[in-house]
Swiss-Prot record:
Transmembrane segments: none annotated. Belongs to the EF-1-beta/EF-1-delta family. It comes from the Archaea. It comes from Thermococcus kodakarensis (strain ATCC BAA-918 / JCM 12380 / KOD1). Promotes the exchange of GDP for GTP in EF-1-alpha/GDP, thus allowing the regeneration of EF-1-alpha/GTP that could then be used to form the ternary complex EF-1-alpha/GTP/AAtRNA. GO terms for molecular function: translation elongation factor activity. This is Elongation factor 1-beta. Keywords: Elongation factor, Protein biosynthesis.
Amino acid sequence: MSDYNLVGVIKVMPTDPDVNLDELEEKLKAVIPEKYGLAKVEREPIAFGLVALKFYVLGRDEEGYSFDEVADIFRQVENVESAEVETVSRI
């Protein structure tokens, strides 16, 4: 984890409240490119039973690293309504 100097928080909204979040989380973890790390995943209740997944993705402040790239990959996964980079911070 010490090789990373940035953390990007990516908020993923499932298509509906009935989506199995455990399965969706595992699918999303599997598509994160190898050069990135993952610090943690949190669940954030939104409304009407809908829960967002917040991925804390680790990267470096250098060319070739883009949290938008990871969000774009997440959007391609089945049962993902949206994936947006909320914040990027130095660590």
